[in-house]
Structure formats: C-alpha cells, structure tokens
Amino acid sequence: MIVPSSNTTMEREFNRIVPGGFSIHSARMRMKSVTEEDLRAMDRQSVRAALELSDAEVSVIGYGCMIAVVSRGRGYDDVVRKRIEKSVHIPTVVSATAVIDALKALGAARIAVAMPYTEELAKSELRFMEKCGLAIVDYRTLGIEANTAVGNLEASVAAETVRSLDSKKADALLISCAQMPSADVLDELEGETGLPVLSTNTATLWAMMRRIGYATPITGYGSLLSGVARSAGGRANLRHPRKPPVPVQGSYRR
C-alpha cells in the first residue's frame, strides 16, 4: 500500500481483515494536514513510494488516499494508476476507482456518504462521484483538517455519522476516507439499515484482491467482502432495517 505519512488506520484495518497467507507492506508519502496544497505535494511522491514497494516484489499496489485523487477531478484516478504502473509494472488499485467500482458491483446508483473532511474537500468528492454517475441522496462531513485527528477517532464516530444520514432513498452507504476507522462497525450498520455499507478501505482491499484473482469471501467486515448481499436490490438478504434517523445535514446540492 501507498499511504499518507500521517495515516494510522489503513494498515491496521488491512492487517485485521486479510486472511492468512497474505502480508501487508506499505510505503508512505509525507502529508500532515488534509488541505489541497498538502495533498498535491503528497501525490508527487507516489512514484518514489511505489519504487520502494517494488523492492519487496509485492503482487499488487493500493494507492490509499481517496481525497487526494477525487479533489483533482474525474479521470485523475486513472492518471495516478497509469503513472505508478508505468514506473514499476505492478498492478495498481487507486482507492477512488475502487470505491466507484465497488458501488457499481453492489448495484448502487444512489448513495449517502459519511466523511471527515472539510466542507470544501467533501464537496469536491461528491462532485467526483456525481460525474461517475452516482446520485448523492445525503451526506455528512465532520470538518476535520488534521489527518492524525481523523485516525484518532473511534469507529463509533463513523457509526454515528452514518446513523445521522437520511438513507431512505439510498442503495448503499459509504464511509469515505482511508484514515477514518470503521471496519469494526460495518456489519453492525448493515444490520441496522438493511443496506450495503462499505468504506474506502474495504473497497480498496476488495479491488486489490480482485486484481490478484482472490475471490474467497471474507466475513465480518460488510457484505462487499463477504458477498452476502451482492447488489443493493438484494438487501433483503440482510437483517431487517430500522427506521432511518432525521438527517443532520441536508441533501447535497451543487
């Protein structure tokens, strides 16, 4: 994985989720604050980080920062992937692409999103998703700029943020940010809402496993990895949903 230097979540969650026989290795790009300037400076370090990982002869690389890519607009995820693959000739997954592909695999066209970002960066992500063909029915963002502060959150914060979304018209719920801890609450949230709930990290891992041909279900971390609910339309396979809460923040508008 290639992660921001201040990311303390992605490696921890991946090591918890991946089955035996796999090992996780990472290289870091310097970034402390989630600002446009810092994100661009960080992104310029991606090839150096990929070269370091290539020395370990890894099978697949995951670029683990959603907002650094989506804030640059639709198509930049492909730019990042091609840049890394051209440099090291290793299959590469970009988190932004993985999230879109995972939502499509679930049959989700309408989503509600929980994020930790500042409002400006959050809206850049929502625009990216809309341009990829998704409808945003609701969102909530926490306005946090310091990346370590996001990593220090309990997974319960992600859960409460998701619970505050108006999910009545959603096909799936997304916890967006590789630094926002959430793996331990995904199954619980699916049971409460009756909807697929995925995170940037579970989508990235799902896509990386697909790139290397691994298709065995992984249980305990949401239906995307377990295969319990293979589409948003199949959400009746999950436990009975509870009534959605009143939204804290209104539906997204341009």
Predicted regions and their residues:
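N-terminal glycine-rich anion-binding loop in soluble enzyme alpha/beta folds
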Residues: 2-48, 117-154
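Conserved beta-alpha
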Residues: 80, 84-145
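Hydrophobic alpha-helical
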Residues: 160-192, 204-205
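Short, well-structured alpha-helical segments in soluble
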Residues: 43-56, 157-170
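Short, glycine-/small-residue-rich phosphate/pyrophosphate-handling segment
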Residues: 1, 105-127, 213-235
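Periplasmic-binding protein-like
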Residues: 59-64, 112-114, 170-177
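Short, flexible loop segments at boundaries between secondary-structure elements
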Residues: 144-149, 195-217
